[in-house]
UniProtKB/Swiss-Prot annotation:
Role: Catalyzes the NAD(P)-dependent oxidation of 4-(phosphooxy)-L-threonine (HTP) into 2-amino-3-oxo-4-(phosphooxy)butyric acid which spontaneously decarboxylates to form 3-amino-2-oxopropyl phosphate (AHAP).
Protein name: 4-hydroxythreonine-4-phosphate dehydrogenase
Compartments, as annotated in UniProt: Cytoplasm
Protein encoded by which gene: pdxA
Named cofactor requirement(s): Zn(2+); Mg(2+); Co(2+)
Length: 326
Protein backbone atom coordinates (compact mmCIF):
# COMPACT_ATOMS: atom_id res chain seq x y z
CA UNK A 1 0.00 0.00 0.00
CA UNK A 2 1.27 3.47 -0.88
CA UNK A 3 1.99 5.57 2.20
CA UNK A 4 0.27 8.95 2.14
CA UNK A 5 1.69 11.75 4.28
CA UNK A 6 -0.28 14.89 5.09
CA UNK A 7 2.11 17.84 5.44
CA UNK A 8 1.31 21.26 6.89
CA UNK A 9 3.77 24.14 6.30
CA UNK A 10 2.84 26.03 9.48
CA UNK A 11 3.29 29.81 9.61
CA UNK A 12 2.95 31.04 6.00
CA UNK A 13 5.43 33.91 6.48
CA UNK A 14 8.07 31.58 7.89
CA UNK A 15 10.36 28.92 6.44
CA UNK A 16 7.83 26.08 6.44
CA UNK A 17 6.79 26.58 2.80
CA UNK A 18 10.45 26.97 1.78
CA UNK A 19 11.46 23.69 3.38
CA UNK A 20 8.63 21.72 1.77
CA UNK A 21 9.35 23.20 -1.66
CA UNK A 22 13.05 22.37 -1.31
CA UNK A 23 12.39 18.83 -0.12
CA UNK A 24 9.92 18.27 -2.96
CA UNK A 25 12.90 18.27 -5.32
CA UNK A 26 13.80 14.82 -3.97
CA UNK A 27 12.12 11.54 -4.88
CA UNK A 28 10.29 10.14 -1.84
CA UNK A 29 8.92 6.68 -1.15
CA UNK A 30 5.55 8.10 -0.15
CA UNK A 31 2.86 10.43 -1.44
CA UNK A 32 3.54 13.91 -0.06
CA UNK A 33 0.32 15.91 0.18
CA UNK A 34 0.70 19.50 1.38
CA UNK A 35 -2.24 21.26 3.02
CA UNK A 36 -1.59 24.85 2.01
CA UNK A 37 -2.59 27.71 -0.22
CA UNK A 38 -1.58 26.91 -3.78
CA UNK A 39 -0.81 30.51 -4.74
CA UNK A 40 1.37 30.91 -1.63
CA UNK A 41 3.36 27.81 -2.57
CA UNK A 42 3.80 28.97 -6.19
CA UNK A 43 4.87 32.45 -5.12
CA UNK A 44 7.38 31.14 -2.59
CA UNK A 45 8.81 28.69 -5.13
CA UNK A 46 9.31 31.59 -7.55
CA UNK A 47 10.98 33.66 -4.81
CA UNK A 48 13.33 30.75 -4.16
CA UNK A 49 13.83 30.19 -7.90
CA UNK A 50 12.91 26.53 -7.45
CA UNK A 51 10.68 24.79 -10.01
CA UNK A 52 7.53 23.29 -8.47
CA UNK A 53 4.55 21.48 -9.94
CA UNK A 54 1.42 21.32 -7.78
CA UNK A 55 -0.90 18.37 -8.37
CA UNK A 56 -4.47 18.65 -7.04
CA UNK A 57 -4.97 15.90 -4.47
CA UNK A 58 -7.50 13.20 -5.27
CA UNK A 59 -8.16 10.48 -2.70
CA UNK A 60 -8.33 7.85 -5.43
CA UNK A 61 -4.73 8.43 -6.52
CA UNK A 62 -1.98 6.25 -5.14
CA UNK A 63 0.91 7.15 -7.45
CA UNK A 64 3.89 8.80 -5.79
CA UNK A 65 4.63 12.28 -7.09
CA UNK A 66 7.76 12.73 -9.22
CA UNK A 67 10.63 14.85 -7.93
CA UNK A 68 9.87 18.54 -8.27
CA UNK A 69 6.18 18.17 -7.52
CA UNK A 70 3.72 17.96 -4.63
CA UNK A 71 0.13 16.95 -4.21
CA UNK A 72 -1.86 19.78 -2.65
CA UNK A 73 -5.09 20.31 -0.76
CA UNK A 74 -5.68 23.98 -1.55
CA UNK A 75 -6.73 26.03 1.49
CA UNK A 76 -7.68 29.71 1.19
CA UNK A 77 -5.71 32.47 2.88
CA UNK A 78 -7.36 35.38 4.64
CA UNK A 79 -4.78 37.95 3.48
CA UNK A 80 -1.64 38.40 1.43
CA UNK A 81 1.50 36.70 2.73
CA UNK A 82 4.78 38.62 2.84
CA UNK A 83 7.75 36.39 3.60
CA UNK A 84 9.22 37.24 6.99
CA UNK A 85 6.31 39.40 8.14
CA UNK A 86 3.74 37.99 10.58
CA UNK A 87 0.09 38.73 9.87
CA UNK A 88 -2.47 37.78 12.56
CA UNK A 89 -5.20 37.82 9.91
CA UNK A 90 -3.79 34.57 8.50
CA UNK A 91 -3.85 32.76 11.84
CA UNK A 92 -7.17 31.11 10.98
CA UNK A 93 -5.60 29.80 7.78
CA UNK A 94 -2.89 28.09 9.81
CA UNK A 95 -5.50 26.41 12.00
CA UNK A 96 -7.55 25.43 8.93
CA UNK A 97 -4.55 23.56 7.50
CA UNK A 98 -4.04 21.74 10.79
CA UNK A 99 -7.73 20.92 11.18
CA UNK A 100 -8.16 19.47 7.69
CA UNK A 101 -4.94 17.46 7.83
CA UNK A 102 -5.88 16.13 11.27
CA UNK A 103 -9.39 15.11 10.21
CA UNK A 104 -8.12 13.28 7.13
CA UNK A 105 -5.67 11.35 9.29
CA UNK A 106 -8.42 10.50 11.74
CA UNK A 107 -10.57 9.06 8.95
CA UNK A 108 -7.72 6.84 7.81
CA UNK A 109 -7.09 8.51 4.45
CA UNK A 110 -3.48 9.26 5.44
CA UNK A 111 -0.93 7.17 7.32
CA UNK A 112 0.84 10.06 9.07
CA UNK A 113 0.90 13.83 9.58
CA UNK A 114 4.06 15.95 9.34
CA UNK A 115 3.89 19.53 10.61
CA UNK A 116 6.03 22.57 9.91
CA UNK A 117 6.66 25.30 12.50
CA UNK A 118 3.81 27.53 13.66
CA UNK A 119 4.09 30.86 15.48
CA UNK A 120 2.09 30.51 18.69
CA UNK A 121 2.37 34.21 19.49
CA UNK A 122 0.72 35.51 16.33
CA UNK A 123 -2.13 32.99 16.61
CA UNK A 124 -2.84 34.14 20.15
CA UNK A 125 -2.50 37.75 19.02
CA UNK A 126 -5.38 37.05 16.64
CA UNK A 127 -7.52 36.21 19.66
CA UNK A 128 -7.34 32.44 19.21
CA UNK A 129 -6.06 30.55 22.28
CA UNK A 130 -3.33 28.21 21.05
CA UNK A 131 -0.56 26.56 23.07
CA UNK A 132 0.88 24.28 20.40
CA UNK A 133 0.37 21.53 17.85
CA UNK A 134 0.42 18.81 20.49
CA UNK A 135 -2.45 20.22 22.49
CA UNK A 136 -4.39 21.17 19.33
CA UNK A 137 -4.32 17.65 17.91
CA UNK A 138 -5.24 16.17 21.28
CA UNK A 139 -8.34 18.36 21.36
CA UNK A 140 -9.20 17.66 17.72
CA UNK A 141 -9.00 13.90 18.25
CA UNK A 142 -10.65 13.86 21.69
CA UNK A 143 -7.48 12.38 23.13
CA UNK A 144 -7.35 13.03 26.89
CA UNK A 145 -3.57 12.71 27.22
CA UNK A 146 -0.70 12.97 24.77
CA UNK A 147 3.05 12.92 25.26
CA UNK A 148 5.68 14.97 23.46
CA UNK A 149 8.77 13.09 22.29
CA UNK A 150 11.81 14.54 20.57
CA UNK A 151 14.26 12.16 18.97
CA UNK A 152 17.63 12.30 17.29
CA UNK A 153 20.24 9.68 16.50
CA UNK A 154 20.88 7.71 19.71
CA UNK A 155 18.46 9.61 21.97
CA UNK A 156 14.72 9.91 22.52
CA UNK A 157 13.42 12.35 25.14
CA UNK A 158 9.81 12.34 26.34
CA UNK A 159 8.17 14.95 28.55
CA UNK A 160 5.88 14.56 31.55
CA UNK A 161 4.76 18.19 31.14
CA UNK A 162 5.05 20.46 28.12
CA UNK A 163 4.16 24.12 27.66
CA UNK A 164 3.50 25.28 31.20
CA UNK A 165 5.40 27.74 33.43
CA UNK A 166 8.17 26.29 35.56
CA UNK A 167 6.25 27.53 38.62
CA UNK A 168 3.41 25.15 37.71
CA UNK A 169 5.50 22.03 37.11
CA UNK A 170 5.57 20.61 40.65
CA UNK A 171 1.79 20.74 41.02
CA UNK A 172 1.37 19.14 37.59
CA UNK A 173 3.53 16.13 38.51
CA UNK A 174 0.99 13.80 40.13
CA UNK A 175 0.81 10.02 40.35
CA UNK A 176 -2.16 9.83 37.94
CA UNK A 177 -0.32 12.11 35.50
CA UNK A 178 2.84 9.98 35.55
CA UNK A 179 0.77 6.80 35.31
CA UNK A 180 -0.94 8.06 32.15
CA UNK A 181 2.22 9.44 30.57
CA UNK A 182 4.30 6.31 31.14
CA UNK A 183 1.54 4.00 29.89
CA UNK A 184 1.30 6.04 26.68
CA UNK A 185 5.07 5.96 26.19
CA UNK A 186 5.26 2.21 26.80
CA UNK A 187 2.30 1.54 24.48
CA UNK A 188 3.57 3.66 21.58
CA UNK A 189 7.15 2.40 21.82
CA UNK A 190 5.68 -1.08 21.37
CA UNK A 191 3.06 -0.36 18.71
CA UNK A 192 4.59 2.48 16.67
CA UNK A 193 8.32 1.85 17.12
CA UNK A 194 8.20 -1.94 17.25
CA UNK A 195 10.17 -2.19 20.52
CA UNK A 196 9.07 -5.43 22.20
CA UNK A 197 9.98 -4.49 25.79
CA UNK A 198 10.69 -0.76 26.14
CA UNK A 199 13.07 0.44 28.84
CA UNK A 200 12.14 3.91 30.11
CA UNK A 201 14.62 5.96 32.15
CA UNK A 202 13.00 8.60 34.37
CA UNK A 203 14.45 11.90 35.59
CA UNK A 204 13.82 13.23 39.05
CA UNK A 205 12.30 16.68 39.34
CA UNK A 206 14.71 18.23 41.83
CA UNK A 207 18.52 18.60 41.79
CA UNK A 208 20.13 15.25 42.67
CA UNK A 209 16.64 13.70 42.35
CA UNK A 210 15.73 15.28 45.68
CA UNK A 211 18.72 14.01 47.70
CA UNK A 212 16.51 11.67 49.79
CA UNK A 213 13.99 14.43 50.41
CA UNK A 214 16.47 17.11 51.46
CA UNK A 215 16.05 19.07 48.20
CA UNK A 216 12.35 18.54 47.64
CA UNK A 217 9.98 15.65 48.26
CA UNK A 218 8.38 15.16 44.83
CA UNK A 219 10.51 12.09 44.18
CA UNK A 220 9.58 10.42 47.49
CA UNK A 221 5.95 11.45 47.59
CA UNK A 222 5.00 11.14 43.92
CA UNK A 223 7.52 9.86 41.40
CA UNK A 224 8.83 6.77 43.19
CA UNK A 225 5.36 5.47 44.18
CA UNK A 226 4.14 5.97 40.60
CA UNK A 227 7.11 4.07 39.15
CA UNK A 228 6.82 1.23 41.66
CA UNK A 229 3.15 0.71 40.84
CA UNK A 230 3.89 0.51 37.12
CA UNK A 231 6.80 -1.86 37.67
CA UNK A 232 4.34 -4.25 39.30
CA UNK A 233 2.53 -4.37 35.96
CA UNK A 234 5.66 -5.29 34.03
CA UNK A 235 6.69 -1.90 32.64
CA UNK A 236 10.49 -1.62 32.64
CA UNK A 237 11.55 1.57 34.40
CA UNK A 238 14.80 2.94 35.81
CA UNK A 239 14.79 5.98 38.08
CA UNK A 240 14.17 8.54 39.22
CA UNK A 241 17.73 9.54 38.43
CA UNK A 242 19.29 13.03 38.64
CA UNK A 243 18.85 14.88 35.37
CA UNK A 244 22.51 15.91 35.39
CA UNK A 245 23.70 12.29 35.30
CA UNK A 246 20.98 10.43 33.38
CA UNK A 247 22.20 11.71 30.00
CA UNK A 248 25.43 9.74 29.83
CA UNK A 249 26.36 6.74 27.67
CA UNK A 250 26.11 4.25 30.54
CA UNK A 251 22.39 4.93 30.82
CA UNK A 252 21.55 5.99 27.28
CA UNK A 253 22.77 2.75 25.72
CA UNK A 254 20.08 0.96 27.73
CA UNK A 255 17.31 3.55 27.37
CA UNK A 256 14.59 3.48 24.73
CA UNK A 257 13.62 6.92 25.99
CA UNK A 258 14.44 9.32 28.82
CA UNK A 259 11.37 10.80 30.50
CA UNK A 260 12.04 14.37 31.65
CA UNK A 261 9.71 16.06 34.11
CA UNK A 262 9.53 19.37 32.23
CA UNK A 263 10.33 20.95 28.88
CA UNK A 264 13.68 22.60 29.62
CA UNK A 265 14.98 19.69 31.68
CA UNK A 266 15.28 17.34 28.72
CA UNK A 267 15.14 19.28 25.48
CA UNK A 268 18.36 21.33 25.81
CA UNK A 269 20.34 18.07 25.92
CA UNK A 270 18.43 16.66 22.95
CA UNK A 271 18.92 19.79 20.87
CA UNK A 272 22.59 20.06 21.77
CA UNK A 273 23.11 16.48 20.61
CA UNK A 274 21.01 16.74 17.47
CA UNK A 275 20.57 20.38 16.51
CA UNK A 276 18.76 20.56 13.14
CA UNK A 277 18.73 16.75 13.12
CA UNK A 278 15.89 16.07 15.55
CA UNK A 279 12.23 15.25 15.11
CA UNK A 280 9.20 15.94 17.31
CA UNK A 281 6.81 12.97 17.66
CA UNK A 282 3.45 13.11 19.43
CA UNK A 283 2.66 9.93 21.35
CA UNK A 284 -0.87 8.93 22.35
CA UNK A 285 -2.67 10.24 19.27
CA UNK A 286 -4.72 7.80 17.17
CA UNK A 287 -2.45 8.62 14.21
CA UNK A 288 1.27 9.16 13.61
CA UNK A 289 2.40 12.78 13.90
CA UNK A 290 5.94 14.07 13.46
CA UNK A 291 7.23 17.62 13.30
CA UNK A 292 10.31 19.77 12.99
CA UNK A 293 12.18 20.70 16.17
CA UNK A 294 12.64 24.38 15.28
CA UNK A 295 10.67 27.59 14.92
CA UNK A 296 9.46 29.71 12.03
CA UNK A 297 12.82 31.44 11.33
CA UNK A 298 11.11 34.47 9.80
CA UNK A 299 14.42 36.09 8.90
CA UNK A 300 15.28 33.16 6.62
CA UNK A 301 11.96 32.96 4.77
CA UNK A 302 12.33 33.20 0.97
CA UNK A 303 16.14 33.50 1.26
CA UNK A 304 17.04 29.94 0.34
CA UNK A 305 19.19 29.71 3.48
CA UNK A 306 16.88 27.60 5.67
CA UNK A 307 18.22 24.22 6.82
CA UNK A 308 15.98 21.36 5.66
CA UNK A 309 17.57 18.83 8.05
CA UNK A 310 14.87 18.58 10.70
CA UNK A 311 11.97 18.64 8.21
CA UNK A 312 13.66 15.94 6.14
CA UNK A 313 14.07 13.77 9.23
CA UNK A 314 10.44 14.39 10.22
CA UNK A 315 9.29 13.07 6.84
CA UNK A 316 11.64 10.08 6.98
CA UNK A 317 10.53 9.23 10.52
CA UNK A 318 6.86 9.48 9.53
CA UNK A 319 7.45 7.08 6.64
CA UNK A 320 9.37 4.68 8.90
CA UNK A 321 6.68 4.69 11.59
CA UNK A 322 3.93 4.29 8.99
CA UNK A 323 5.71 1.25 7.53
CA UNK A 324 6.09 -0.31 10.98
CA UNK A 325 2.35 -0.08 11.63
CA UNK A 326 1.18 -1.41 8.26
Amino acid sequence: MTIKLAITPGEPAGVGPDLIITLAQQQWQAMLVVFANAELMRTRANELNIPLTLLPYDASRTDIQPAGSLYIVDIPLQDEVIAGKLNPTNSQYVLDTLHQACQMNLNGEFQALVTGPVHKGVINEAGIPFSGHTEFFAQQSNTPEVVMMLATEGLRVTLATTHIPVTAVSAAITQPKLDNVIRIIDHDLRTKFGIAKPHIFVCGLNPHAGEDGHIGREEIDTIIPALNALRQEGITLTGPLPADTIFNPKYLQQADTVLAMYHDQGLPVLKYKGFSQAVNITLGLPFIRTSVDHGTALDLAATGQADVGSFSIAIKEAISLAKSTQ
